[in-house]
Amino acid sequence: MKISLGLIYGGKSAEHNVSLQTALAVTKALNTEKFDIHPIYITEEGEWLRGEKLTEPVSNVRMLQFEQNAKTFLPTSLNESMFPQPTSADEKIDVVFPLLHGPNGEDGTMQGLLELLNIPYVGNGVLASAAGMDKVMMKDVFAQAGLAQAKHLSFNKKDYEKATPDSLEQVEQVLGYPCFVKPANMGSSVGISKCRSKEELQTAFDLAFQYDRRVVVEEGVVGREIEIGVLGNDEPKCSVVGEIAPKTDFYDYKAKYEDGDTDLIIPASVSEDEYKTIHDMAIKAFKSLDGSGLVRADFFLTEKGEVLINEVNTMPGFTPFSMFPLLWKHTGVEYPELIEKLVSLAIERHQEKQTIKTTF
């Protein structure tokens, strides 16, 4: 019997276009003999639409003809039923795969909605998604878990605006140059800047605060950028490691999604000891967040052989040139099998939750 799989994509986020690419790639990879696909598109304004197909080129995705007045996954009013009853068995959704990146999708908000609706969904739960999306909170969790990481500082917008000169001086004294300024709640390198001077630093703060009210500043680390995939629930497994080798100054949005001006080296050349350290730190990071389903863990490997965790991505991209699927492909897990495994993990975790008592 086929599994009815709802693909939620788009979203009210600066990473909207990345989500479109991910959704198209996943749709092409799905085995239609095993899955009935139900695309659910969230516009940039936050409107939910359901359509029959997601087969258009990415540039035309917004032009898809959605059914007028079709039942949406989320009603426009809370006075309506939170999840309208399907008119036929074909409309029932068994599992949701939220292919959303960034705020309003990857940050625990969508996961919370799906929890309330009691629908199995692929990926991390509310806690891991929220903490994994917020770089400030994530770094606090990693510090508590004893994971080595680069020096960093965090600022909120109002405090920064009240004492801009002091904030800039603090960055210079504690971190120095070069440093990286990032919105706390954003991915795909959106809003990130590399700074080599006070002028660049102030401009970078202004840019980052356009995307979030909190900003994290990290010291520049001289080293290789190494990534590893984690897959599973309570007994997670790791993929081979890959290396990001950008031809530009750093691995920004353009290098990731537009011109492809970056080499992905898979598997990366690391020693057995280095791999074990990366593997163990990735598993520890996953468990410290109470992860489920998947994460991609990103590290720095310094010239001295020190491994520093940079961040985890709780819903890594599935574009044709995204690192996470490629890591698992080189580990022996092809696209269709990877997606099937994620759906299976979603059902497994959902069934486990159903055994928890909710009355006293």
From Swiss-Prot:
Main enzyme class: ligase
Cofactor(s) for this UniProt protein: Mg(2+); Mn(2+)
EC number(s) per entry: 6.3.2.4
Residues annotated to bind Mg(2+) 2: 311, 313
NCBIfam families: D_ala_D_alaTIGR, PRK01372.1, PRK01966.1-2, PRK01966.1-4
Catalytic activity: 2 D-alanine + ATP = D-alanyl-D-alanine + ADP + phosphate + H(+)
Database matches in InterPro entries: ATP-grasp, ATP_grasp_subdomain_1, D-Ala_lig_Van_CS, D_ala_D_ala, Dala_Dala_lig_C, Dala_Dala_lig_N, PreATP-grasp_dom_sf
The organism of origin for this protein: Bacillus pumilus (strain SAFR-032)
Protein name: D-alanine--D-alanine ligase
GO CC annotation, single: cytosol
Residues binding ATP: 172-227
Any GO molecular function: ATP binding
Pfam families assigned: Dala_Dala_lig_C, Dala_Dala_lig_N
